[in-house]
């Protein structure tokens, strides 16, 4: 139960960080390009790798600490970093087909299903 509470707290902090960073960046760049989301996603990828590497190589806090930091904070900050991490893991293990399916599938299906949801949402 304590681990779940810590993940929830880390998730709340990740959400607030995402909101704050995306909003600040978007105000700087204006509304013509989704710069806030762009910066959050690429920053999230860097931070995910940094935190993962730090927890793996520098601290031996165990899987619970990784779960709190990566699933809690980073999961709420951006799921894009998880998508990239899982894709790189597939590539690193030479699972080319699964990597290609993961990358193209999530992007193409994500666009198609968002469009379908938008269409259906307007019908209701």
From Swiss-Prot:
It is found in: Cell inner membrane. Na(+) binds at residues 75, 78. GO terms for cellular component: plasma membrane. GO terms for molecular function: fluoride channel activity; metal ion binding. GO terms for biological process: cellular detoxification of fluoride. The chain crosses the membrane at residues 5-25, 35-55, 68-88, 96-116. Na(+) is not transported, but it plays an essential structural role and its presence is essential for fluoride channel function. It is a multi-pass membrane protein. It holds the Pfam family CRCB. Keywords: Cell inner membrane, Cell membrane, Ion channel, Ion transport, Membrane, Metal-binding, Sodium, Transmembrane, Transmembrane helix, Transport. It catalyses: fluoride(in) = fluoride(out). InterPro entries: FluC. Belongs to the fluoride channel Fluc/FEX (TC 1.A.43) family. Fluoride-specific ion channel. Important for reducing fluoride concentration in the cell, thus reducing its toxicity. PANTHER family: FLUORIDE EXPORT PROTEIN 1-RELATED. HAMAP family: FluC. This is Fluoride-specific ion channel FluC.
């Amino acid at each position: 139960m304590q681990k779940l509470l810590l993940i929830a707290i880390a998730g709340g902090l990740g959400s607030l960080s995402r909101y704050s960073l995306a909003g600040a960046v978007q105000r700087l760049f204006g509304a013509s390009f989704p710069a806030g989301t762009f910066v959050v996603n690429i920053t999230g990828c860097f931070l995910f790798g940094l935190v993962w590497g730090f927890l793996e190589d520098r601290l031996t806090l165990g899987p619970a600490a990784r779960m709190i930091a990566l699933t809690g904070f980073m999961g709420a900050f951006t799921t894009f970093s998880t998508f990239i991490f899982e894709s790189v893991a597939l590539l690193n293990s030479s699972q080319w087909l699964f990597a290609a399916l993961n990358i193209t599938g999530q992007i193409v299906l994500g666009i198609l299903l968002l469009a379908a949801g938008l269409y259906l949402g307007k019908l209701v």
